[in-house]
């Protein structure tokens, strides 16, 4: 009787410890992969990722962040909802325009590459895509992907990117819905 109580108690403690550890691991993975520690958005941006809702006076904010000694690193991003398509299908995606150097200081996507490189080899409009999206659209390195989205003027835009790298994070949803490209290529 006492042995079964002790075994039950240890089993319960083990289960709780395991759940807490998995929760911590999942949270750390999300923060390091794509959330980062803090995000600053226009108050209305999160409602539907509308590109019209951008931060005003971005240069002033950049200056403040660069000169704040308590901030280790930061990265500006342009985030747009859109559609990715290939000859093998299409998928709703979130397009993330980044500066590769500053982004590598706040996320670990550059270390999550399973194929290709992190903005090193393709000079004209490279893209990084998640492994799940690559599988769904049957994409590989150096293959073309077309992205369609609405710009800040309400006009539909279509751009062609070339897959430079394929990443895999702990989140298959993130890997299936996100594409990284250079911010300068969105201008």
Predicted regions and their residues:
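Basic-flanked hydrophobic alpha-helices used for secretion and membrane insertion
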Residues: 132, 139-187
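N-terminal signal-anchor/signal peptide hydrophobic helix marking the start
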Residues: 1-9
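Extracytoplasmic
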Residues: 33-35, 88-93, 114, 124, ...
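Hydrophobic, regular-secondary-structure patches
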Residues: 12, 17-94, 117-123
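Short, charged, solvent-exposed linker or helix-capping segments at domain edges/interfaces
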Residues: 51, 105-109, 158, 175
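Short beta-strand boundary microenvironments
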Residues: 96-137
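Short beta-strands and strand-coil junctions in structured, solvent-facing domains, enriched
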Residues: 46-48, 80-84, 101-104, 134-136, ...
């Amino acid at each position: 009787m006492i042995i079964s109580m002790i075994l039950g108690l240890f089993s319960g403690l083990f289960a709780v410890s395991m759940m807490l550890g998995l929760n911590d691991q999942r949270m750390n993975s999300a923060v390091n992969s794509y959330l980062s520690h803090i995000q600053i958005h226009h108050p209305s941006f999160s409602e539907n990722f509308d590109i019209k809702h951008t931060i005003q006076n971005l240069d002033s904010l950049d200056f403040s962040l660069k000169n704040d000694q308590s901030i280790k690193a930061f990265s500006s991003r342009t985030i747009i909802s859109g559609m990715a398509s290939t000859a093998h299908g299409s998928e709703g995606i979130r397009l993330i325009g980044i500066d590769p150097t500053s982004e590598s200081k706040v996320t670990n996507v550059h270390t999550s590459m399973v194929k290709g490189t992190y903005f090193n080899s393709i000079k004209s409009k490279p893209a990084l895509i998640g492994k799940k999206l690559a599988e769904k659209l049957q994409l590989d390195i150096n293959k073309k992907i077309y992205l369609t989205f609405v710009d800040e003027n309400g006009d539909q835009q279509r751009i062609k990117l070339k897959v430079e790298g394929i990443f895999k994070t702990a989140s298959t949803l993130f890997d299936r819905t996100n594409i990284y490209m250079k911010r300068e290529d969105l201008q």
